[in-house]
Amino acid sequence: MRVDLFDFDLPDERIALRPAEPRDSARLLVVNPHAESRPHAESVPHAESRPHAESAFSDHRVGDLPSFLRAGDALVFNDTKVIPAQLEGIRHRDGAGGQQVSATLHMRVGPSRWKAFAKPGKRIKEGDRIAFGHSGESCLLGSLDATVEEKGEAGEVTLAFDLSGPALDEAIAAVGHIPLPPYIAAKRPEDERDRADYQTIYAREEGAVAAPTAGLHFTPALFEALDRAGIERHFVTLHVGAGTFLPVKADDTADHKMHLESGTVSAETAARLNAVKARGGRIVCVGTTSLRLIESAAEESGEIRGWSGATGIFITPGYRFKAVDMLMTNFHLPRSTLFMLVSAFSGFETMHAAYKHAISTGYRFYSYGDASLLFRKDK
């Protein structure tokens, strides 16, 4: 499909620079192509007073989520934890003077090796030495130095650090910064609040460069409400990479290549999710990262298997979903792979109309913005 078919106009003022407080007070746009199956507005505490009759859309709050789920449904969360993966340093070559460079780590490929996006990418060569954390910041744990081992396309490099394992992790934590999405970083600098705001309350597996942002809306109070409603919670891990921020430069979706991200679905979690399906429950993914991982781990039959590896799954309209029934996700960029994914999930025309509604009624977009709850069009 042509990439420009996924374009839309988004006013700058719709981009959220801070999250809602409390987190579960964010707005929730429910998008149900099968409108007759959604709850009546009067049964949902925070339904906004707008006639929905036969509409596929209804306006709510994230705290209303239990009203749209049934006992026995299962929420699938991505428990990856964002690391301070934005590094600043000085490049050295053949004993010559240094040049300022930045690198955003995006996928670990060994105890001492990371793939990263480096700037200025054109001036970096294989064999270059980069000393990170030496310009105005001291690394208390020793030099965070690396060699450029490989150079790929679009500024991607493989860095071989002198440190390894936990020592490398501690050094990165000491000098790195939270890599805010470009659309936020362009409007304000990262600050201490972001270290908490840009992390889910259940994050535990370190390795992500970007937060699984749909999960940012969850609070202990919302978890308690979901427990009372008999909704199961399960966790998988997909370490979100910096590739999620990269624009689609191709003119056709067939020519776009996704960057790989590493993830794991344990055999135990797979078995529990299969049991949910067998009992008639629904698999509800919290975030596109959870969905992409579950779909990567699913057989054509819909059975989910234990899985570990790197996925580059690219979901566009025409994709046949194998396991996921519902999706909770934030509002995405025009022409992005994630808007393509939601268009595949709930329908191309439906999602264009949903985003038009969201923009006209003041929903907040992107990582710190509001959320949507999507029903699958072919269910």
UniProtKB/Swiss-Prot annotation:
InterPro entries: QueA, QueA_dom1, QueA_dom2, QueA_sf. It comes from Rhizobium leguminosarum bv. trifolii (strain WSM2304). Keywords: Cytoplasm, Queuosine biosynthesis, S-adenosyl-L-methionine, Transferase. SUPFAM superfamilies: QueA-like (SSF111337). GO terms for molecular function: S-adenosylmethionine:tRNA ribosyltransferase-isomerase activity. NCBIfam families: PRK00147.1, queA. This is S-adenosylmethionine:tRNA ribosyltransferase-isomerase. The keyword Transferase applies. The gene is queA. Transfers and isomerizes the ribose moiety from AdoMet to the 7-aminomethyl group of 7-deazaguanine (preQ1-tRNA) to give epoxyqueuosine (oQ-tRNA). Its EC number is 2.4.99.17. Residues 35-58 are annotated as: Disordered. Pathway: tRNA modification; tRNA-queuosine biosynthesis. GO terms for cellular component: cytoplasm.
